């Protein structure tokens, strides 16, 4: 069974291998020009006159309080901006001596390319915003062991360390799901290190996690990524002396948020004040078009996902026209529900409208929802999970898809059903879930079917019923579907011809 599983995955990799240029892609999974545009799908960094900046300041104080502790020592020694630090971190998590090109070439390749992919995901938004770091804004010295004054001229938003740490963690969690929660915990901590050292604000770190997840969604469209995951998995199994047929995928279900996410904010915490203020700040949007959108999208259903992401993808999603995409949406929704629902009773937190004696934008749901936990946000978990998967299905529309996925989570703050910190944690949970889903062969096959379906339904691609033969130009890849073009824009796929206008 194990051999069949790996063989089928290898076939999928081989089928989509053609067309990727090797020069730039030797060290990354996503070229610079193809990264999702974080300046579009994420909000601008909080200004110093904003309510969100209060949370940044509170967390800066928390970070400084950790410095003279073992947690602070960890943050300091993990400040290098090189793949070597991730080699150390992941070797510790995997309980092996080292990850190196010489001794573990497959693990090393997956690590280095994931590292650089995550790191590159923040370059453009850093240049766009040039946000001042805490050490600059507050006239502080650098504190991390390997941090330097270079940071003073490098943008704070988003956090590059967070992005390359979380990207690497997501890749390794997918590679060995049996250890996913331990791997993910270290990925979360690696981002928080930057708050402790004073190199970044909390909002920078939040954005870094999301940049990483978005770019790893794009990485999944590169056939080399799956090949490298499989090679690293086989190498690690051999390194640990595991028996033939050992399957780390079958030994892990959905990620357990209680093992890698922080505890929800308590009312005794200073950060609770920031949650309350952000609740009031979002409430003012209720009588605006943005508030109307939050109210209209309160429905948690397959139909709502079809509507929201169909609009973002520029197609009509329906069981008739896009059965594979509908099947994929239902699968992701069910897994997102499972992931969030199991965590809610474990990490129970009162919802804002209950805690503050308020009403919501959806009063008809208040009675049934008042006894349920605010942490995590099921809607946010669903929206961001779906966005990451649909961005893989339709990378041409990735920025709009990711933007809508982000907004779907923020809706819940406007509506009064969730706290801001719950929403941020839920996006981490979603990223972890998507990594786990990619370890399953049926999921990968469904994504490829959905991709093909999107191409057939997207504007500008129509069936051509002529007898023109394809030219002898090189074969190329349309995200998982081998295709051969001719000089007139004809694509031959599975015996059918399509005209790309």
Residue map of PLM features:
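Conserved beta-loop-beta connector loops within the AMP-binding
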Residues: 482-489
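C-terminal tail/sorting-segment detector
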Residues: 490-501
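Hydrophobic alpha-helical bundle signature of multipass membrane enzymes
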Residues: 22-197, 218-224, 228, 234-415, ...
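Short, glycine-anchored, charge-dense loop/turn motifs used at functional sites
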Residues: 343, 478-481
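Short acidic/histidine-rich active-site segments
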Residues: 200-205, 416-423
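Bacterial Sec-dependent N-terminal signal peptides
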Residues: 1-22, 244
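Catalytic phosphate/nucleotide-handling subdomain of diverse soluble enzymes
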Residues: 213, 431-433
């Amino acid at each position: 069974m194990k051999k069949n599983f790996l063989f089928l995955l290898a076939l999928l990799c081989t089928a989509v291998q053609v067309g990727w240029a090797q020069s730039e892609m030797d060290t990354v999974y996503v070229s610079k020009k193809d990264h999702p545009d974080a300046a579009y799908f994420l909000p601008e960094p909080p200004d110093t006159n904003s309510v969100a900046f209060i949370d940044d300041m509170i967390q800066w104080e928390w970070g400084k309080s950790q410095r003279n502790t073992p947690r602070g020592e960890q943050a300091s020694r993990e400040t290098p901006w090189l793949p070597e630090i991730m080699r150390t971190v992941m070797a510790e998590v995997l309980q092996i001596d080292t990850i190196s090109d010489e001794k573990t070439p497959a693990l090393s390749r997956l690590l280095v390319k994931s590292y650089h992919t995550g790191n590159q995901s923040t370059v453009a938004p850093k240049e766009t915003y040039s946000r001042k770091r805490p050490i600059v804004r507050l006239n502080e010295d650098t504190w991390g062991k390997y941090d330097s004054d270079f940071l003073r001229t490098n943008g704070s938003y988003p956090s590059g360390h967070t992005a390359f740490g979380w990207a690497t963690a997501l890749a390794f969690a997918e590679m060995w799901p049996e250890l996913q929660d331990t791997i993910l915990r270290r990925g979360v901590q690696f981002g928080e290190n930057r708050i402790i050292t004073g190199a970044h604000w909390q909002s920078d770190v939040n954005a870094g996690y999301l940049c990483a997840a978005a770019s790893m969604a794009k990485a999944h469209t590169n056939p080399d990524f799956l090949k490298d995951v499989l090679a690293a998995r086989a190498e690690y199994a051999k390194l640990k002396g595991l028996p033939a047929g050992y399957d780390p995928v079958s030994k892990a279900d959905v990620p357990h948020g209680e093992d890698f996410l922080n505890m929800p904010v308590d009312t005794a915490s200073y950060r609770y004040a920031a949650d309350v203020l952000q609740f009031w700040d979002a409430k003012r949007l209720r009588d605006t078009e943005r508030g109307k959108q939050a109210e209209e999208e309160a429905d948690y259903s397959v139909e709502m996902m079809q509507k929201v992401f169909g609009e973002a993808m520029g197609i009509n999603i329906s069981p008739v026209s896009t059965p594979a995409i509908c099947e994929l949406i239902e699968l992701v929704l069910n897994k997102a529900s499972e992931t969030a629902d199991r965590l809610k009773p474990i990490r129970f937190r009162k919802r804002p409208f209950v805690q503050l004696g308020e009403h919501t934008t959806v009063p008809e749901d208040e009675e049934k929802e008042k006894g349920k936990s605010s942490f995590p946000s099921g809607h946010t978990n669903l929206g961001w999970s779906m966005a990451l998967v649909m961005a893989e299905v339709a990378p041409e529309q990735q920025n709009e898809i990711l933007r809508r996925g982000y907004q779907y989570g923020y809706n819940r703050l406007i509506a009064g059903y969730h706290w801001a910190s719950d929403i941020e944690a839920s996006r981490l949970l979603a990223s972890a879930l998507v990594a786990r889903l990619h370890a399953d062969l049926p999921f990968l096959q469904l994504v490829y079917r959905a991709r093909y379906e999107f191409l057939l339904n997207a504007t500008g691609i129509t069936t051509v019923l002529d007898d023109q033969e394809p030219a002898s130009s090189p074969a190329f890849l349309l995200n998982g579907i081998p295709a051969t073009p001719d000089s007139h824009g004809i694509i031959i796929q599975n015996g059918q011809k399509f005209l790309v206008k």
